[in-house]
């Protein structure tokens, strides 16, 4: 009898060419499917994820699922997978899921975080885990700008021009930045995110924090629907897929408002 297994995994994206399998490159999906292939005595097991992450991007709460005929408890799955996965991937949680659960299509919202180190001196021990932006920033102006992203908008100005997705309307439930000493942490919760959307928003809001732009520019950019008018794409290493929400929309709202 086949069962569907849901896992929450974390990974350090530094030495991966992204999540999705690519020929000749090291990827998170490739490493995970290789472990499952060994556990299934050479049979390929396909893994589905909540979404793809690019090279250098990290995850604390990526969600995946796969179907298997093996009869193991959740704890046995967790131990067996972690015993064979490389050190830069860890399975944090395992449970048997309903047959109609899908890591991507059942998701109601996602949370991304982005970390920025703002000290004058670069921290060599953090260089793979946050962007470095050694400039004086006005946090209140940045949060004023981020609040303008709340609600449902066309985010064309904040997605890569390379995207092939035509529907670029998304709902942003939460967008804010907090400072803990020289470390900034942006938090975004939304119904979905376009390619490079978080990184372009961060790059634009950092310019607002420096005084190069006004917070009101966010509304202008949303209306313009033109990627060329927004700020630069922030580096990959500061980005984390933090959590995927599968609860109903009302619960998502209560979670992000709390």
UniProtKB/Swiss-Prot annotation:
Transmembrane segments: none annotated. It is an enzyme of class 5 (isomerase). GO terms for molecular function: RNA binding; tRNA pseudouridine(38-40) synthase activity. It catalyses: uridine(38/39/40) in tRNA = pseudouridine(38/39/40) in tRNA. Keywords: Isomerase, tRNA processing. GO terms for biological process: tRNA pseudouridine synthesis. Substrate binds at residue 112. The active site is at residue 54. Its EC number is 5.4.99.12. Formation of pseudouridine at positions 38, 39 and 40 in the anticodon stem and loop of transfer RNAs. Homodimer. Belongs to the tRNA pseudouridine synthase TruA family. This is tRNA pseudouridine synthase A. It comes from Geobacillus kaustophilus (strain HTA426). The gene is truA.
